[in-house]
């Protein structure tokens, strides 16, 4: 309630301020600049304007185009007001520099893993597919609807016994009613249960048609050595994704590649090992320290 008074009184002793997400940061950045001499770091997580623009391109909803323009103005103001802006991948960095070349922005590792224990991929002990995503996020709802309506009918013809587990909190009625004997809507699962799904399913599927930024569900699957089938949106921000992930944007191509991968033991084992290696190479504490060192005087 009285945070501004506190900041005014103590601001001289604050060396760094780390702000997260545009709708939160916009409330504080002016006061931080007014009452402190702190180095301000802004972490945007993803580009809201880019995500909403892509949703507009998919749906044609004019309100999304206006919302995208509003977000772009707000996000750019925050980026330019900060001493440095962080984003989870090179994709956001490039997108920002295209519209604001003067912006100070860099990609940082979105996730950090101190110890990646590699488990052997046992093809014969794994079966079925999984999707994980919170349903308060519109792209996840769209992904499951596209999966159910455009992918599952053809996939079941190729793999009649296949099951796809839909995991994630608060599935709306429009998702619940998509359930079939092959598409199981499980809803919320604990971290322990989620890890069991990663260890028992052959493939994690991420059929996102829009969104922005590096996708946590993709990195998480790779962290557990579970091969991923996704779209170019799902693979966004992962350098060299084609050698680690299977990627298709059209439903027919998605089905063909997914069915082939599901039955290819050697390729699944290779992708599992490649996933572990990618995580070790790109999401270590040592790597993060090198990237953020200049801003926090860690060098």
Predicted ranges, named:
Residues 14-15, 83, 199-213, 224-226:
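Acidic donor-binding loop of glycosyltransferase active sites
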Residues 35-52:
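Active-site proximal beta-strand in glycosyltransferases
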Residues 48, 63-85:
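Membrane-proximal helix-turn-helix segments that form the acceptor-binding/catalytic region
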Residues 244-252, 260-265:
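Conserved acidic donor-binding segment of nucleotide-sugar-dependent glycosyltransferases
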Residues 7-27, 41:
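Short N-terminal targeting/anchoring amphipathic segment
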Residues 217-221, 227-231:
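Short hydrophobic beta-strand element within catalytic cores of glycosyltransferases
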Residues 80-86, 98-102, 106-200:
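Conserved catalytic-core segment of nucleotide-activated headgroup transferases in glycan assembly
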Residues 263-296:
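A charged, aromatic-enriched C-terminal amphipathic alpha-helix characteristic of glycosyltransferases
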